[in-house]
Design a protein with these regions (language model features):
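Sec-dependent N-terminal signal peptides
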Residues: 2-11
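Short hydrophobic "helix-edge" motifs at membrane interfaces and signal-peptide entry regions
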Residues: 3, 28-29, 138-139
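Short, intrinsically disordered, charge-balanced linker/junction segments flanking boundaries
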Residues: 11-17
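All-alpha RGS (Regulator of G-protein Signaling) helical domain and cognate RGS-like helical scaffolds
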Residues: 12, 110-120, 127, 131-134
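Active-site-proximal alpha-helix that buttresses catalytic centers in soluble enzyme cores
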Residues: 18-109, 114-118, 158-180
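Short, contiguous, well-ordered secondary-structure segments
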Residues: 35-37, 41, 126-135
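Soluble or luminal CAZymes and related metallo-dependent hydrolases
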Residues: 64-68, 122-129
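Active-site-adjacent alpha-helix immediately C-terminal to a catalytic or transition-state-stabilizing loop
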Residues: 131-179
């Protein structure tokens, strides 16, 4: 039984390494969309006193979330993954993820959350604007989109974890996923 477990563990390690190599290879080809759900921010949804201009009224990254963001950035820099742009939701937890992972980013309202009833009416316009932006994007490298669960769920039909990256092509075909 111990021998079998050792073989099983060895297999799992090599599968993980192969998938990491596969992800690096995909990203080095360029022209990929990299959706990132914001890193760990305790709680769920948005507080009632939410103000987009005041981070103290929002969920923010925990210490673990900051480390998770830095690990995402480290993965990109250590593997020399080229990026055209990093776009982020205007929510502080997304901006914090982008800041700790990549340093430079631009905010785009089409990446904002529409989870709470307060923002649900924005959903169709945001998804339309997001798809239009991606359709018009012609970069040679990769496009990073730091956003929320609901946006990724709507566009890719994927249930992402906090700090997970989902790689797709411009037609929103999911090619790979990686947790950090």
């Amino acid at each position: 039984i111990k021998f079998f477990l050792l073989i099983l563990l060895s297999f799992n390690i090599s599968v993980k390494a192969n998938s990491n190599d596969e992800i690096q290879s995909l990203l080095k080809e360029g022209k990929k969309l990299i959706f990132i759900r914001h890193a760990i921010a305790p709680g769920g949804g948005d507080p009632l006193d939410f103000d987009i201009l005041k981070c103290e009224t929002q969920r923010n990254l925990s210490i673990e979330g900051i480390e998770q963001s830095k690990n995402i950035g480290k993965f990109f820099s250590e593997n020399n993954i080229k990026i055209d742009k990093v776009l982020s939701s205007e929510w502080c937890r997304c901006k914090q993820t982008a800041q700790h992972a990549f340093d430079k980013y631009e905010t785009k309202s089409f990446l904002n959350s529409f989870f709470s009833a307060k923002f649900a009416s924005n959903k169709n316009k945001q998804i339309y604007d997001l798809k239009k932006y991606i359709n018009e994007w012609n970069g040679d490298n990769n496009l990073v989109l730091v956003t929320h669960y609901v946006t990724i769920q709507e566009v890719l039909n994927i249930t992402p974890s906090s700090g997970e990256i989902i790689i797709s092509d411009k037609n929103f075909n999911v090619l790979a996923r990686q947790n950090f």
